[in-house]
C-alpha cells in the first residue's frame, strides 16, 4: 500500500489529519476511472464524520485552485486526464492571447473569441485543443480561477455621453466603461487608474470605476507613476515600517562589535558608477606571504540582516518589493533610505557592519578556499570605475591625488591582469552588450545619450562579486539546508535547433551535439569576434538563452558555466541576497555552537523548503516586473526624445526581423524604431524564420540582422511608445 509522503507534515498541521493535496492528486492521476468522494473515503480509510467533512472541504479547495475537476456525475478527476490545464493569460494588442502554464513547454494560443471571457493576467482553467502540423495547440476557456484585480492605467474619454477608459497597456485590448467616477469634471484625455467591477463575460462590456486621477500632461514622473501602478510595485512605507526604521539606532554600539572581526585598518575601497546609489560592497586584496602562492581577496558586503530581522514589518515590506527598481531619474528602494543609503551604505571613513567573504586564490586566480564571518570595516575611499581604470593606466593627476592608496590600487590591477587571462569568471559566456546612458535635463527629459563603455575596472569588480557568490554557494551547499540558488537553465532543444540552422546559413557551426555546453557558445563568440557577423550572431545567441530564476533546486548556472551559484553581494537591493546572509549566519553560529547571548541571534534564520520555494518564485516575478517597469519608462523617454527628431535622416543597423517588418537601431542614439513591412513597396516581402530575414518575392532583395541602412523618422506615438521609420533613398 502506497503511503502519503506528506503524512508527517499534515500530522503537524492538523489534529485529525487527512490525505494531503499532493497525495489526492497522485491518486486521481493514476486512477483509470472517475472517483466519487465516497470511493476516495474508502481508498483512504476515512470512517468518521469529522474527517469526511475535512476531506470535502479539501476537495472543494482543490477544485477552486484548479487541482481537481468536479464532474457533472459528482466525481473527481485530475485535470491532466481531461487535457485541462491551469495557466496565466498573456494578452496581445491584436485581441488574441496566450495561456502560459507551469507544465507545458510552449504557451497555448487563445483566440480573440476565447479572450472575450478573460483578460491579461487572469489565472484560468482551459481545455487543450490539439492541432496538427506546425501550428501551436490552442486553449478553450473553461473557468476563471483568479481574476487579475490590478488597477489598470489608461486615458479617460467621453463619446456620446458614454464614459470609458482605454488602457495604456495594450495587452488589455478593450475599453473599460465607467459607471462612476471619483468626480464629475474629469478632463477628457486625463490619465487615470481604474478598478474593474465586472470582468468580461461573452458579449458584455468590461466595467470599472476610476480610483485615481494621475494627471494629463505626460512627463517622466508621470511615466514612472504609471509604471508603478501597471506593474503593482509598492512605493510607500506603512506606519509600522516607518516606526521600526525610526527606532533603529544610527550608532554602532559595543554589542555590535561582539564576535566581529575588526578590519577597519584594511584599505577597503568601493568602486561603482558615477551615478551609483547603493554602496553595499567593498574590496581589498593582497599577495600572500609567499607571492608564488597567490592572493587573498576580501569582499565585504553590508550586513543588512543585522538591521532587517525576519518577519518584522520591515522584512515583510522588503519581501513584497523583492528588489529595488531603478528608473533613470528615481529609485524605488527595497529598503528605506535610512538603511539603503545610510546605515548599510559603505561610505568612506565611516564604520560599517559587514558580512565578509575572505577568499584564498591561486597564482592563476582560481578559488582555493574561503571563509565567511561577521566583520566591521571602514571604507578608505569611494572610487568610480573610470577613476580606477585611469589610475591603472597612469593618469598623473589621479595618481597624485590618491598617492597614499597607490600600492593597494596597483594590487587590484595585478589581480585584474590575472583575471583577464583566466579565472572562474572567464569560463562563462560573455556578451558585449551596448548599454546606453541617458543624460537628463532639468525637466527630466533626455538631453543626450552616450554608450557606457565597460572597462577593466568594471570587469574586475564583476569577477570579485562572481567569486564571492561562488564561494557562498559552495559554503551553503555543504550543509544541504534550503537556500535560494540562482539557476540559469541550458537553452531549450528547440532553440538550439533553430540557432544551429541560422548559424549554418552563415557558414558557422555550434559544437556540442544535442546539448552544447557554455564553452561551446563561448568559443563560437570568440571565433567570430573579428567578423562582421559578430553583432548579429551575439544577438541570436542571447535570444536563444533561458531566463535565470531563483529556486531551492540547484540546477547550476549555464551562462556562467557553474555547477552552483547564489546571490550574496547585494542585500540592499535584492531580497534573495538578504535571505542568504541569514542562512550563512545560522550556519556560522551553528558551527561555532555559540550561545544566543554571544551574538545577534535574530539576524540568523533558517527557512523551510516550502518557504524558500515560495520566496524564490515571488522574487523571480518581482525581478521581471522591475525590469518591465523600467523598460516602460525608458521606452517613453526614448519616444519623447525622438518626437523632436521626426523628419530626420539617420544611420542605423537592423536589430530584429519579424513577420511584420524589421527594427533598426539608430547608431547615434542606440534607439530602435520599426520599418513596417507595408512600407517596403518595391516588392512583396515574406519572412524567412530560418535566416531571420525578409526576402522580396520578385527581386530577391533581403533585409537581415546586421544590415546597415539609412532611415527617416516618420512618426512617434507617445501613448503606444512606438517609433516608426521608413527606408530613406536619396533622389
Curated annotation (Swiss-Prot):
CC annotations in GO: cytosol
Summary of the function given for this chain in its UniProt record: 3'-5' exoribonuclease that releases 5'-nucleoside monophosphates and is involved in maturation of structured RNAs.
Domain RNB: from-to ranges: 260-589
GO biological process: mRNA catabolic process
HAMAP family noted in UniProt: RNase_R
Principal place of residence: cytoplasm
Name of this protein: Ribonuclease R
Class of this enzyme: hydrolase
EC nos: 3.1.13.1
Keyword S-adenosyl-L-methionine appears in the UniProt entry: no
Catalytic reaction list: Exonucleolytic cleavage in the 3'- to 5'-direction to yield nucleoside 5'-phosphates
Location of the S1 motif domain: 647-728
Cellular localization per UniProt: Cytoplasm
Family, per entry: Belongs to the RNR ribonuclease family. RNase R subfamily.
Complex and partners: Monomer.
One Pfam entry name: RNB
SUPFAM superfamilies to which the protein is assigned, alphabetical: Nucleic acid-binding proteins
Leader sequence segment: none
Amino acid at each position: 500500500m502506497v503511503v502519503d509522503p506528506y503524512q508527517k507534515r499534515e500530522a503537524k498541521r492538523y489534529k485529525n489529519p487527512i490525505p494531503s493535496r499532493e497525495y489526492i492528486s497522485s491518486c486521481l492521476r493514476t486512477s483509470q476511472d472517475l472517483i466519487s468522494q465516497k470511493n476516495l473515503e474508502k481508498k483512504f480509510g476515512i470512517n468518521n464524520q469529522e474527517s469526511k467533512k475535512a476531506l470535502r472541504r479539501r476537495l472543494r479547495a482543490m477544485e477552486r485552485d484548479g487541482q481537481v475537476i468536479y464532474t457533472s456525475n459528482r466525481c473527481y478527476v485530475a485535470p491532466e486526464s481531461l487535457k485541462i490545464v491551469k495557466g496565466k493569460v498573456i494578452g496581445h494588442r491584436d485581441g488574441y492571447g496566450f495561456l502560459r502554464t507551469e507544465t507545458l513547454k510552449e504557451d497555448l494560443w487563445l483566440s480573440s473569441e476565447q479572450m472575450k471571457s478573460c483578460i491579461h493576467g487572469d489565472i484560468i482553467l482551459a481545455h487543450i485543443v490539439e492541432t496538427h502540423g506546425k501550428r501551436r495547440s490552442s486553449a478553450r476557456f473553461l473557468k476563471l480561477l483568479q481574476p487579475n484585480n490590478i488597477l489598470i492605467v489608461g486615458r479617460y474619454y467621453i463619446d456620446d455621453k458614454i464614459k470609458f477608459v482605454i488602457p495604456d497597456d495594450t495587452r488589455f485590448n478593450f475599453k473599460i466603461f465607467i459607471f462612476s467616477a471619483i468626480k464629475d469634471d474629469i478632463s477628457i484625455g486625463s490619465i487615470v487608474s481604474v478598478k474593474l467591477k465586472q470582468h468580461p463575460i461573452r458579449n458584455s462590456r468590461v466595467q470599472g470605476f476610476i480610483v485615481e486621477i494621475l494627471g494629463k500632461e505626460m512627463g517622466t514622473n508621470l511615466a514612472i507613476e504609471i509604471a508603478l501602478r501597471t506593474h503593482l510595485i509598492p512605493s510607500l512605507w506603512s506606519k509600522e515600517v516607518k516606526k521600526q526604521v525610526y527606532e533603529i539606532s544610527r550608532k554602532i554600539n559595543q554589542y555590535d562589535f561582539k564576535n566581529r572581526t575588526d578590519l577597519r585598518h584594511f584599505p577597503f575601497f568601493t568602486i561603482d558608477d558615477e551615478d551609483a546609489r547603493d554602496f553595499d560592497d567593498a574590496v581589498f586584496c593582497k599577495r600572500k606571504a609567499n607571492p608564488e602562492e597567490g592572493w587573498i581577496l576580501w569582499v565585504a558586503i553590508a550586513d543588512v540582516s543585522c538591521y532587517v530581522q525576519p518577519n518584522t514589518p520591515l522584512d515583510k515590506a522588503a519581501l513584497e518589493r523583492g528588489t529595488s527598481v531603478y528608473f533613470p531619474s528615481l529609485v524605488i528602494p527595497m529598503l528605506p533610505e535610512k538603511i539603503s543609503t545610510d546605515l548599510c551604505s559603505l561610505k568612506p571613513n565611516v564604520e560599517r557592519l559587514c558580512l565578509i567573504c575572505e577568499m584564498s586564490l591561486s597564482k592563476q586566480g582560481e578559488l582555493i578556499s574561503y571563509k565567511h564571518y561577521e566583520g566591521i570595516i571602514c571604507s578608505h575611499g569611494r572610487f568610480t570605475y573610470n577613476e580606477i581604470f585611469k589610475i591603472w593606466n597612469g593618469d598623473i593627476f589621479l595618481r597624485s591625488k590618491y598617492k597614499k592608496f597607490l600600492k593597494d590600487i596597483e594590487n587590484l590591477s595585478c589581480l585584474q591582469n590575472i583575471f583577464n587571462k583566466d579565472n572562474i569568471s572567464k569560463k562563462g559566456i560573455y556578451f558585449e552588450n551596448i548599454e546606453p546612458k541617458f543624460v537628463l535635463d532639468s525637466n527630466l527629459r533626455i538631453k543626450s545619450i552616450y554608450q557606457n563603455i565597460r572597462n577593466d575596472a568594471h570587469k574586475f569588480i564583476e569577477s570579485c562579486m562572481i567569486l564571492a557568490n561562488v564561494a557562498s554557494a559552495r559554503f551553503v551547499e555543504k550543509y544541504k539546508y534550503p537556500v535560494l540558488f540562482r539557476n540559469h537553465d541550458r537553452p531549450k532543444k528547440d532553440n538550439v535547433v533553430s540557432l544551429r540552422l541560422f548559424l549554418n546559413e552563415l557558414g558557422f557551426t555550434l559544437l556540442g551535439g544535442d546539448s552544447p555546453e557554455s564553452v561551446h557558445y563561448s568559443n563560437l563568440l570568440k571565433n567570430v569576434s573579428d567578423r562582421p557577423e559578430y553583432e548579429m550572431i551575439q544577438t541570436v545567441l542571447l535570444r536563444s538563452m533561458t531566463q535565470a530564476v531563483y529556486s531551492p533546486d540547484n540546477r547550476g548556472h549555464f551562462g556562467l558555466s557553474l555547477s552552483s551559484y547564489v546571490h550574496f553581494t547585494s542585500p540592499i537591493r535584492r531580497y534573495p541576497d538578504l535571505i542568504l546572509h541569514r542562512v550563512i549566519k545560522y550556519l556560522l553560529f551553528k558551527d561555532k555552537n555559540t550561545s544566543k547571548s554571544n551574538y545577534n541571534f535574530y539576524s540568523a534564520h533558517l527557512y523551510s523548503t516550502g518557504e524558500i520555494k515560495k520566496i524564490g518564485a515571488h522574487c523571480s516575478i518581482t525581478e521581471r516586473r522591475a525590469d518591465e517597469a523600467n523598460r516602460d519608462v525608458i521606452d517613453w523617454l526614448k519616444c519623447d526624445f525622438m518626437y523632436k527628431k521626426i523628419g530626420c535622416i539617420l544611420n542605423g543597423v537592423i536589430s530584429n526581423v519579424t513577420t511584420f517588418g524589421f527594427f533598426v537601431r539608430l547608431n547615434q542614439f542606440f534607439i530602435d524604431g520599426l520599418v513596417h513591412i507595408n512600407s517596403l513597396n518595391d516588392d512583396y516581402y515574406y519572412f524567412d524564420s530560418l535566416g531571420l530575414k525578409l526576402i522580396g518575392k520578385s527581386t530577391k532583395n533581403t533585409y537581415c540582422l546586421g544590415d546597415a541602412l539609412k532611415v527617416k523618422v516618420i512618426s512617434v506615438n507617445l501613448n503606444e511608445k512606438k517609433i516608426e521609420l521608413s527606408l530613406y533613398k536619396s533622389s
